[in-house]
C-alpha cells in the first residue's frame, strides 16, 4: 500500500509538473496585466517576467473591479502596447508593496514604479494584521532580505513591522523568523546576536524549496487554465501614450446615464445596497478621521526603499466620491 501511494504521488507530481511547465518566464506581455494572487505572491514569477521596458504598477482592489471595461489599467496599457507588471488585490497596502519593492528593485530594469494609493488605507489602525497576513509573501520577504544593496536600516524596519503584524499567524511568523535568522545572521535584529544552527538552515532551505516549487506549479497552472500561453521569446512593442482625454470623455458619457441618484453612485448598486439604509447611516462617519495612521509611516518606508534603490516612484491618489465615500 505504501509503495502504491508513493507511485501515485510521483505520477501525480510529474503530471502537474508537466502541465504547469518547467519555467516561469511567460515572455508574454499579458502576464503582467494578468490579475492573480498566486502571481503576486511569487517573487520568482514576477521577477522572471520583468523586461527592459516593464513598468511596475502596485495597487489593491481596483485591479479586481471593472476589468471588463475599457477604463481598467490592464485594458488601457495592453491597448497601448505598454509592458506593465500589475501587483495587487484587496488587502494590499503600503507595507506589502514596500516588501515587494525591496525584493524586486534589482530586477526592475526600467527603475520605474507606480503606486495606486487608496485614501481608505489611512484609517486609524492602518493595515490590519489579518489583511497583512493574507497578502504577505514569504518569497518576496526572503528576496528582500537577500537584496544586498538594500540598507540594513530599511531591512530592519521591514522586519520589525512584519514580525509585529504576523502575530495573528504563528506558523507564518515562525517561517519568517527562521528566514530572518538564516538570511541575515548577526547583521540585523537590532544588533542582537542570532546563532543560526545547522537545523535552522536545513529546515529553512527545505521549506523554501517546497514553497517555491508550490508557487511555480500554482502560477503555471493558473496561467494556463486562464487560457494564456508562454512564448519562446519576449518581443518589445512600440508603446504609445493612451489618449487620456478621449477616455475621460467616453467614461463620463457612458456612466452619466447609469449614475442618476443624488450621490452619483451606480443606480443598480445604490438601489440594492444603500437606498434602504440612508436614514440610519446619515452622519455616521462624521467623526471618522484619516489624519493619524501608521499607514503614513508605511508609505514613507515604501518611498525610502525606492530612493535607496534608485527607483523613480509615482503616486496616484485614487479619486473618491466626497458625497458618500
Range-by-range predicted roles:
Residues 1-18:
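Hydrophobic membrane-insertion alpha-helices, especially the h-region
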Amino acid at each position: 500500500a505504501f509503495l502504491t501511494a508513493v507511485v501515485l504521488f510521483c505520477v501525480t507530481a510529474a503530471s502537474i509538473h508537466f502541465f504547469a511547465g518547467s519555467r516561469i518566464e511567460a515572455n508574454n506581455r499579458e502576464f503582467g496585466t494578468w490579475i492573480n494572487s498566486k502571481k503576486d505572491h511569487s517573487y520568482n514569477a514576477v521577477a522572471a517576467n520583468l523586461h527592459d521596458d516593464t513598468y511596475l504598477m502596485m495597487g489593491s482592489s481596483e485591479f479586481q473591479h471593472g476589468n471588463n471595461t475599457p477604463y481598467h489599467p490592464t485594458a488601457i496599457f495592453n491597448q497601448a502596447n505598454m509592458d506593465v507588471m500589475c501587483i495587487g488585490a484587496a488587502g494590499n497596502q503600503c507595507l506589502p508593496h514596500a516588501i515587494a519593492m525591496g525584493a524586486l528593485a534589482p530586477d526592475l530594469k526600467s527603475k520605474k514604479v507606480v503606486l495606486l494609493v487608496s485614501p481608505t488605507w489611512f484609517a486609524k489602525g492602518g493595515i490590519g494584521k489579518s489583511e497583512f497576513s493574507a497578502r504577505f509573501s514569504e518569497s518576496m520577504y526572503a528576496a528582500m532580505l537577500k537584496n544586498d544593496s538594500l540598507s540594513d536600516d530599511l531591512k530592519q524596519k521591514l522586519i520589525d513591522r512584519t514580525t509585529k503584524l504576523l502575530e495573528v499567524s504563528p506558523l507564518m511568523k515562525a517561517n519568517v523568523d527562521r528566514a530572518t535568522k538564516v538570511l541575515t545572521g548577526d547583521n540585523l535584529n537590532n544588533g542582537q546576536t542570532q546563532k543560526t544552527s545547522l537545523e535552522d538552515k536545513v529546515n529553512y532551505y527545505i521549506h523554501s524549496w517546497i514553497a517555491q516549487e508550490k508557487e511555480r506549479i500554482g502560477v503555471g497552472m493558473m496561467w494556463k487554465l486562464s487560457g494564456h500561453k508562454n512564448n519562446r521569446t519576449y518581443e518589445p512593442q512600440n508603446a504609445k501614450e493612451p489618449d487620456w482625454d478621449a477616455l475621460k470623455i467616453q467614461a463620463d458619457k457612458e456612466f452619466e446615464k447609469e449614475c442618476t441618484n443624488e450621490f452619483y453612485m451606480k443606480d443598480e448598486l445604490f438601489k440594492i445596497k444603500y437606498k434602504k439604509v440612508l436614514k440610519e447611516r446619515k452622519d455616521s462617519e462624521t467623526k471618522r478621521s484619516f489624519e493619524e495612521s501608521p499607514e503614513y509611516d508605511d508609505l514613507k518606508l515604501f518611498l525610502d526603499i525606492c530612493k535607496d534603490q534608485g527607483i523613480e516612484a509615482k503616486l496616484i491618489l485614487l479619486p473618491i466620491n466626497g458625497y458618500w465615500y
